[in-house]
């Protein structure tokens, strides 16, 4: 299914909704890319092929049963390895957290799952999102850097190892790797997307960002994530309705 990589995520999602494509086959296409390129690109901190295919089969069965589906139903999404999850490690790029999981998902992970997305795994990041860079290489030239700190999140898009990914930015960590890897990276305004459950570097500078092949793709992903969260006060301030004028 090599032609799948020429489609936008919106087109893929529509094909899944119309039963012209199933999530298992979609995920297998990305697994093939991972098998081809991961040994050179080194974008993944954690990837569980078996778990992904199990979740894909569940998504297909859900759709076949006639139940309603979300905007990202059956679409695999990669997460930067500072985004908390309870069912896979969140190591934050450091040996100090090797194998550690969280007691619950980050808010954005729950939003992704509610939209029908499948969590693929974790992508490599600079240590603690600001120290030593990871081993990830630029997919276009293995001798060059993919940029950081969301190195793996940009690299998986550029190498077609994932259709969508999530990163973070405190001082350029979305827009820089997006530029270096030739993909679309979107860092929304402060407070639009909850950081609850994500490694904090700076309360006033940390942002969640998204990566994809096209502006349409990142807009679709961002729309799912933009939501008020009472556990991230920055979103509460942004979404507070202004007082009516006298």
Labelled PLM ranges:
Residues 187-241:
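A short helix-breaking turn/cap at a secondary-structure junction
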Residues 1-54:
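An N-terminal boundary/leader segment
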Residues 72-208:
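Short glycine/serine-rich loop/turn segments
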Residues 242-246:
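A short, hydrophobic C-terminal helix/tail in secreted or cell-surface proteins
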Residues 19, 80, 214:
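Short, conserved phosphate/pyrophosphate- and ester-handling motifs at nucleotide-, phospho-/glycolipid
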Residues 10-13, 28-31, 53, 57, ...:
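Predominant activation on well-ordered alpha-helical scaffold segments within soluble catalytic domains
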Residues 59-75, 241:
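Immediate post-signal peptide segment of exported/extracytoplasmic ligand-binding proteins
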